[in-house]
Amino acid sequence: MEKIVAVVICGLVALSAAGRSAAATNRDDLLRSASHLSGLPVRRVVPEEVLASPRYDGALLQATYREYPRLLRSIDTALYARLGLMPRSLQAQLVPDARVSRAWYDPAARRLLLRRTPTAQRTRVVNELVRALVDQNFNLRRITGLRVRDRDRALAARSIVDGTAALASGVTASPVQGPPLERFLQFESGLGPGKALAKELRYLGGSRALASALRLFPQTTEQLLHIDKFLERERALPVRLPTRIGDWKLSASETFGELDVRSLLRAFSVPNAVPTAAGWGGGRVGLYVSPTGQTTAVLALRWDTIDDAVEWRDAVTRYVGAAFPGATARDCPPLDRCWSSTWDVASGVLGTTSVFASGRASDTIAAALFTQK
C-alpha cells in the first residue's frame, strides 16, 4: 500500500513539474514572438501573475486610479458635462470597465497580469508583452504622473506605446459606439492614431525610426496625428487662461490638443471633424468658479491660419446643435453667437484665436477671454 501511495505522489509531482515546464515554455514562446513581431530585444523575463477576476479587476482599477486620481476625475466630470458629452444629472463613468480586460502589463510593478477565467487570447497576451518590451527598452515609468501635468502630452505618449504594441500583435480597436461620452472616450484612446504613426515610421525608417518615437514620445497629439509635425518636433502655440475674470476664479486648467478637438466633434458626428481639427495650433480648457460655487467651462484654441479658425467657427454651430438640443441662438457682440439651453453657451473667433464657453455667464467670460491681449 505504501508503495502505491509513493508511486501516486511521485506521479503527481512529475505531472506538476511537467505542467510548470509547459507553462514556462509557452510563456517564453510568447515573449520571443512579441520580440520578433516588434523588433524589440528581450532584456529580461517578464514576471506574470494569474489572478482570479475580483483580484484582477481590483489591481487594474487601483492602477487606473493611480494615474487618474479623484481630483482629476472630478474636473473632467464637470468639463464633460458642460461640453454636452453627458446629461447634467449623470455621473460620468470615466474609468474603463476592467471586466473587458483579460491581460494587462503593469509598468509600475513591471509584471504581466492575467485573468484566470476567461483566459486572454494569444494576441492580447502578445500585445501586453510588446508593451513590456517597450518598457524594458524605453522605460514606461516616464509616463507616470504625466496625465496630471499635461493631458495632451500624456495622450500622445500613451497612444504611441499602445499603437506600437497593436501594430506588432495585430490587435485592433473595438468599433466606436454608444452615447457621446463613450464615443469621445473611445476616440480619445488613440489606438488608431498611435498605430498609424508607428506604421508610418517603420515604413520610412524601419525599427530605428519607430524607436525614436518611443525614446522621445510625441510631445502633442498633433505630432501623433501628423508625421511631419513629429519629425519637425513642432511645439504647440501657447494659450493662457487668466486666473480671474471679474469675480470668477480659475479653479482648474488642462491642455486640450488636436485629438481632443477631433474626438469632441466626432463624438457628435460633426461633418469634416478630422480636417477641422487638423488646423489646431494650441489649446487649453479650464473651469471658472463663481463666489456662489457655479462652474463654467472654457475652451481657448489657437489655429494655424484664419481659414482654420473659420472652419472651427462653422463646426461649432453644428456641434452646439447636436450637443445642446433645442438651444436658442442669439447675437452677443463681440462674440459670434450665444445659445440658451441646458447650459448657456457662447462662442467667438477673432483672427486665429477662438473661445468657447459653457455655463453661467458664459457670454461675459468668453468675451473677456476673447478680447484679452
Locate each region found by the language model.
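Bacterial N-terminal signal peptides
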Residues: 6-16
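Catalytic glutamate of the conserved HExxH
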Residues: 124, 128-136
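Catalytic zinc-binding patch centered on the HExxH motif and its immediate surroundings
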Residues: 57-71, 89-109
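Short pre-active-site segment immediately N-terminal to the catalytic Zn-binding motif
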Residues: 112-126, 156
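N-terminal mature-domain "stem" immediately C-terminal to a signal peptide or N-terminal signal-anchor/transmembrane
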Residues: 22-74
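Post-HExxH zinc-binding segment in Zn-dependent metallohydrolases
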Residues: 30, 133-178
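C-terminal soluble interaction/assembly domains
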Residues: 281, 292-373
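Pan-zinc metallopeptidase signature
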Residues: 184-295, 300
